[in-house]
Amino acid sequence: MAFTVYDCHEDIRNILVTPQIRARFCRLEPGSGSLDFGHTHDLGHEIFIILEGRVEFQISGNVNELGPGQMCYALVDEPHSVRVIGEEPVLMYLSVTPHIQPTHTFYDDDRNRRPPHFRPSSDYNTETDSTTPMDEIIDRHVDTARELYECARENLATQEAQAALLKRALTDDDLETANAIRETMWLPQLELFKQMHTTADVWNTLAPRAGSVNAHY
């Protein structure tokens, strides 16, 4: 099956946007950006890879210069900002995982958290579902939350039932039994994580229509 190849010179946009990840190419012009306190992500780790040009990144108060072929990252709750240095435009890849609204947390001049900053889906180069009635989306959101709860209950029951068996197998150095128990423990966790992604997907559909939104920064 064919797949799409993307080019950092032509596809300057969000390319992949799912609850698991948001990935994009960016172009930053000379003189743009600043090393202010910046913003944070409540849930997401963000990775930056410089493809062309040079920048300075500020992450949690520390500043470093990056050039082509270099990367850095900002973890959850780490304030970060960037500015271009030199006369050359910057091409950069970035990804944030996971991608769940509200994606950015901003701060006032005293570094106090501002209210949640929900954004329209168009900010991420995706379309908001504007045709499905909101009552239906809200009901779907509640249904997926309930399914997540049931998955969590089933997962907990399995982990509790298998924990002592796994301890015994490892104590006895019985790796064959331990391998089988580990697989038994993994399967309900797999379903739990899948349901978490489904729940996040419905939430990302609900959030832009559930109140006011603020475009861009």
Which residues does each PLM region occupy?
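Short beta-strand His + acidic residue motifs that chelate non-heme Fe in jelly-roll/DSBH
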Residues: 57-58, 74, 80-86
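C-terminal non-catalytic accessory extensions
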Residues: 168-217
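A short glycine-rich, His/Asp/Glu-containing loop-to-beta-strand
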Residues: 2-38, 44, 95-104
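A generic "binding-loop/recognition-motif" signal
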Residues: 43, 62, 78-79, 88
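Long, charged, low-complexity terminal extensions
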Residues: 130-185, 189
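Short acidic-glycine-tyrosine-enriched beta hairpin
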Residues: 18, 60-77
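Double-stranded beta-helix
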Residues: 85-149
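Glycine- and acidic-residue-biased ligand/ion/polar-headgroup-sensing regions
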Residues: 43-55, 69
